[in-house]
Swiss-Prot record:
Species annotation: Colwellia psychrerythraea (strain 34H / ATCC BAA-681)
Pfam families, per database record: Chorismate_synt
Designated name of the protein: Chorismate synthase
Lineage of source species: Bacteria, Pseudomonadati, Pseudomonadota, Gammaproteobacteria, Alteromonadales
Self-association and partners: Homotetramer.
PROSITE patterns: CHORISMATE_SYNTHASE_1, CHORISMATE_SYNTHASE_2, CHORISMATE_SYNTHASE_3
Length: 373
């Protein structure tokens, strides 16, 4: 299997399966001298960790990360950083009934056809369990970017099913009005406090029905420097979409206004420039594939997981029709735990592009002052 490495100068290679002994990652290209401890990584891992509320999977993993290499006396050395997380709460017996059948909506059929075999225990390599290593690696990138630029990367769930987040006093949702501390204080990472109770009732009903529901996640990077992105084929927004689309269950990504631009006229959509700053940010902080210095804003659509307790039709390994019910412990809404994963993938993309920009354009000087974001 190829395709396990993300990035060009700041690279992350992950390995491991859902029900294997553990998960791991190698991060190469991290500059030396960054103060780094396991506690720095654990903060985001705990936000993603399963079994933390009634609205996520009941699988309980400590997800305690170990730094194996690349850090000496509390600082990165510039050599590859090795990370490891042990799996401790596998329950492979839950998947015995699907060993010979394909779960509809999952990677079972495509993995089987591509590789001629598959790890049916929780999906093996195709499981979202793999994303724990992305979150750990992303925490390194977030820390470096925060110290270098004061950059913050934050995400929240802005829609679950037909429940959509609003701004203050019912105004349309706006990332600039989000109280990020309140986002961390509710189990849904939801920015609209007026709908938390409604969300709880809604998801409890979904769980009773043994079903699942989709979600929308919004991720925002602030204090991004101008100039990140490598046109033509490595445009910043293209690589952001690549990183976010690689997250399990993501079926759509928008940058800035995304598909809403279809209804906009050019006179509305263009982000006019003034000496005081940009008038709007319909572009989501990227112009011509290069960061403009404005907030980078992206939205992710996550499908409802197909691992549900509702009987569905499928075929077995010999192509015969059969019915299937997926047992095991699964998230009723995978979008909730996708919040730190989205932050991680945006951080990894921006970190990689910063190093690429510095490598080629460090000596470029421009007399035009940066426009305020």
């Amino acid at each position: 299997m190829s395709g396990n490495t993300f990035g060009k100068l700041f690279t992350v290679t992950s390995f491991g399966e859902s029900h294997g002994l553990g998960l791991g990652a190698i991060i190469d290209g991290c500059p030396p001298g960054l103060e780094l401890t396991e506690a720095d990584l654990q903060i985001d891992l705990d936000r993603r960790r399963p079994g933390t509320s009634r609205y996520t999977t009941a699988r309980r993993e400590a997800d305690e990360v170990k730094i194996l290499s690349g850090v000496f006396e509390g600082k990165t050395t510039g050599t590859p950083i090795g990370l490891m997380i042990e799996n401790t709460d596998q329950r492979s017996k839950d998947y015995g009934n699907i060993a010979d059948s394909f779960r509809p909506g999952h990677a079972d059929y495509t993995y089987w056809q591509k590789y001629g075999l598959r790890d049916y225990r929780g999906g093996g390599r195709s499981s979202a369990r793999e994303t724990a290593m992305r979150v750990a690696a992303g925490a390194i990138a977030k820390k470096y970017l925060a110290e270098k630029f004061g950059m913050t990367i934050q995400a929240c769930v802005t829609q679950i099913g037909d429940i959509v987040a609003s701004g203050p006093k019912g105004a349309p949702f706006d990332v600039n009005t989000v109280d990020w501390s309140s986002v961390e204080d509710n189990p849904f990472f939801f920015p609209d406090e007026t709908k938390i109770e409604q969300l709880g009732e809604y998801l409890r009903d979904i769980i009773k029905e043994k079903d699942s529901i989709g979600a929308k996640v919004t991720v925002v990077a602030t204090n991004v420097p101008v100039g990140l992105g490598e046109p033509i084929f490595d445009r910043l927004d293209a690589d952001i979409a690549h990183g976010l689309m690689s997250i399990n269950a993501v079926k759509g990504v928008e940058v800035g206004d995304g598909f809403a631009v279809v209804n906009q006229k050019g006179s509305e959509h263009r982000d006019e420039l003034t000496p005081e700053g940009f008038s709007t940010n319909h572009s989501g902080g990227v112009l011509g594939g290069i960061s403009s210095g404005q907030q980078i804003i992206a939205h992710l659509a996550l499908k409802p997981t197909s691992s549900i307790g509702v009987s569905g039709k499928t075929v077995n390994l010999t192509g015969e029709a059969t019915d299937i019910i997926t047992k095991g412990r699964h998230d009723p809404c995978v979008g909730i735990r996708a919040v730190p994963i989205a932050e991680a993938m945006l951080a990894l993309t921006l970190m990689d592009h910063f190093l690429r920009h510095r490598g080629q354009n460090a000596d470029v000087q421009c007399n035009t002052p940066d426009i305020e974001a």
